[in-house]
Amino acid sequence: MGKGGALSESVIKNIVLSYSYVAIWIFLSFTVIVYNKYILDKKMYNWPFPISLTMIHMSFCSTLAFLIIKVFKFVEPVKMTRETYLRSVVPIGALYALSLWLSNSAYIYLSVSFIQMLKALMPVAVYSIGVLFKKEGFKSDTMMNMLSISFGVAIAAYGEARFDVWGVILQLGAVAFEATRLVLIQILLGDKGIKLNPITSLYYVAPCCLAFLFIPWIYVEFPVLRDTSSFHLDYAIFGANSFCAFALNLAVFLLVGKTSALTMNVAGVVKDWLLIAFSWSVIKDTVTPINLFGYGIAFLGVAYYNHAKLQALKAKEEEKKKIQQADEESGRLLEEREGDVEGKKNDQSGN
């Protein structure tokens, strides 16, 4: 084959790899959500201890992240001072602990399908908190889009057959804490030039998260676990669950590294629809037409938001290219001018 054929094979290989990473991420994300629901739901495995489950995940992920970074050295650690850790990582760890605790707690009260619908509010929360912290500029058209997403989720909530107020409060709290965490990552780490991939994030954040979770665990879940047989774990069930949670973080690392964060957002939309279909067909959760109509409105709003972000990124890249081209042109003209001046000096000295 010629060069064209070789190039074609290379392009096809990259496309196949990208789709493979997307498929792996969707599968693992799907598996972790359904697995957590299975463990926590009182009608299934009936182990309703969300803090304990999250602590098991964090312990497992902390250990594996330590082995990958410090022992096997597959991933380079980030330079982290004590001051940066205390001022930046600790607040992020606290928010992450709260987000995971509340989101896992919601599985006890709400269906998988309805939780995915409520998660559509994430862009609304991130944008609103970004504006509050002055990381995002207020734009009326963007705010209208955020309101349309909220309106769609409100309709979906109105049509929910198993509506539970406490479950909704828990999930909305999880969304709020996660959105705040994402904005703080940008403020506390991004502005300092510190970039954490999912593996280094687990290495630095998971132990901190574990420490924060230990405080409510002692008062809320430990007394119940101590007084019941629930304290004896099924290592096969919880080991596989923890491994899936870690593998999901590894998949995020591969997906974002080989494609982009936007690809993950789009893949996330596909995963949400698959989870809703699975929740309805296999778990037998009730999904009403009003649910789907409301989520459809929210879905269109999220899709438009992602499209607008993509267009903004493209415009930013084009602007960078124009500035770079202008700088190169200015440099070339300056060199030519200096060359002309040097030539005239040589002519004058020759005369």
UniProtKB/Swiss-Prot annotation:
Localization in the cell: Membrane
Q: Is this entry keyworded Mitochondrion?
A: no
| SUPFAM superfamilies in UniProt | Multidrug resistance efflux transporter EmrE (SSF103481)
List GO terms (cellular component aspect): endosome; Golgi apparatus; Golgi trans cisterna; membrane; trans-Golgi network
Instruction: Identify the residues that the record assigns to the EamA domain, covering every copy.
Output: 38-156
The set of disulfide-linked cysteines is: none
- Transmembrane stretches, start-end: 15-35, 49-69, 89-109, 113-133, 141-161, 165-185, 205-225, 236-256, 263-283, 286-306
Segments of this protein annotated with the region Disordered: 321-351
Query: Is the Electron transport keyword given for this protein?
Result: no
- UniProt keywords, alphabetically: Membrane, Sugar transport, Transmembrane, Transmembrane helix, Transport
The main place the protein resides is: membrane
InterPro entries recorded for this chain? Sugar_P_trans_dom, TPT_transporter
In the bilayer, the protein is annotated as:
Multi-pass membrane protein
The family this protein is said to belong to: Belongs to the TPT transporter family. TPT (TC 2.A.7.9) subfamily.
Q: What is this protein called?
A: Probable sugar phosphate/phosphate translocator At5g11230
Highest lineage ranks of the organism?
Eukaryota, Viridiplantae, Streptophyta, Embryophyta, Tracheophyta
